[in-house]
């Protein structure tokens, strides 16, 4: 977002200079993270439509089965101070109460472990069937988060001489800081078996996440997302086996947090179990400043699905001034498995499948 665009200008200046040591660049990068409060912005996933419990708590139980999702993102591997994010979630639908329950764990490492965070979230959703083809889900989420900053991983300028890094103690204060807080979020989605659209609001209580005892509230984040699935399979050939279908699904995700906003839009298609997709991230008509365009990356996806298993790999091609050659882009992989349990014959409950990542 905006802080990343600002950082791209600084990084370009640093990497163009042959006199700047790679460790000094790493130090400057981490200090930018700490002093600009870039850590106050949330993690973003390119495969937002697949990591549904992170997208909106109302998706908890939306598969009407038990579902497990694993997600891994490696951002900017070409830099010393890269980002590594891992998430794991499990959710289940309770037919009798028309409710979904989800549990999500997230681990994020920034700046080669200088800044890190761990989050544990519990989600609840309720499903309301409006008509035979339309349903609404409302969800809430409570999160316990711990964030850390460790200066021991940094190398400071007074530890360098003309011969390079000395390893001697620095006059800068080393330290390890931690902050814990509770976070509240909520969301809702309207959907049928072909489309979905949702609104989610995160950090409703704007918790204080300062490491140093002052006030640094986490800004509220608002996301609006949706998608529509077009089934291109000949109606005469359509069967109950979704693996044989040919579908195209345009999706979008708009998010706004603090003074920054971003838009992801694109589509993915499924042809006999093979998935291909492409998205653009940015708002090209918007400029934060002269010469500072909101133009971030192109995301390409390849994947495979079979019955309850879905695997997707995506790569972000950086198109901003923080160019691909310096950052190495971003890698992301999602593995989703839905445990398909046959319905009981005693009672048939009206269910509308939500077309998330299908």
Model-derived features: positions:
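Subset of outer-membrane beta-barrel
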Residues: 41-358
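Cleavable N-terminal export/targeting peptides
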Residues: 1-42, 340-358
């Amino acid at each position: 977002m905006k802080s990343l665009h600002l950082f791209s200008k600084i990084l370009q200046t640093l990497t163009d200079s042959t006199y700047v040591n790679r460790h000094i660049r790493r130090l400057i990068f981490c200090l930018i993270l700490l002093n600009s409060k870039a850590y106050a912005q949330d993690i973003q996933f390119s495969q937002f439509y697949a990591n549904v419990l992170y997208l909106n708590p109302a998706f908890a139980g939306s598969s009407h089965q038990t579902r497990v999702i694993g997600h891994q993102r490696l951002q900017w591997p070409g830099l010393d101070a890269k980002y590594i994010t891992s998430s794991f979630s499990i959710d289940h639908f309770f037919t009798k109460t028309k409710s979904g329950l989800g549990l999500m764990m997230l681990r994020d490492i920034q700046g080669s472990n200088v800044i890190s965070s761990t989050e544990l979230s519990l989600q609840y959703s309720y499903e309301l069937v409006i008509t035979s083809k339309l349903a609404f889900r409302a969800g809430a989420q409570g999160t316990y988060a711990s964030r850390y900053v460790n200066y021991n991983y940094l190398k400071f300028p007074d530890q360098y001489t003309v011969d390079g890094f000395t390893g001697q103690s620095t006059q800068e204060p080393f330290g390890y800081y931690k902050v814990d807080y509770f976070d509240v979020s909520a969301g809702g989605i309207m959907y049928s078996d072909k489309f979905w659209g949702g609104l989610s609001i995160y950090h409703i209580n704007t918790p204080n996440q300062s490491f140093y005892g002052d006030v640094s509230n986490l800004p509220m984040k608002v996301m609006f997302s949706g998608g529509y699935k077009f089934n291109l399979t000949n109606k005469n050939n359509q069967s109950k086996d979704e693996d044989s279908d040919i579908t195209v699904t345009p999706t979008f995700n708009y998010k706004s947090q603090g003074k920054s906003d971003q838009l992801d839009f694109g589509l993915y298609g499924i042809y006999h179990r093979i998935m291909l997709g492409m998205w653009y991230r940015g708002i090209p008509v918007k400029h934060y400043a002269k010469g500072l365009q909101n133009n971030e990356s192109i995301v390409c996806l390849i994947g495979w699905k079979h019955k309850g298993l879905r695997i997707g790999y995506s790569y972000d091609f950086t198109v901003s001034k923080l160019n691909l050659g310096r950052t190495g882009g971003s890698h992301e992989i999602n593995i989703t498995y839905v445990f398909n349990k046959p319905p009981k014959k005693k009672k048939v409950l009206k269910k509308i499948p939500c077309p998330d990542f299908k």
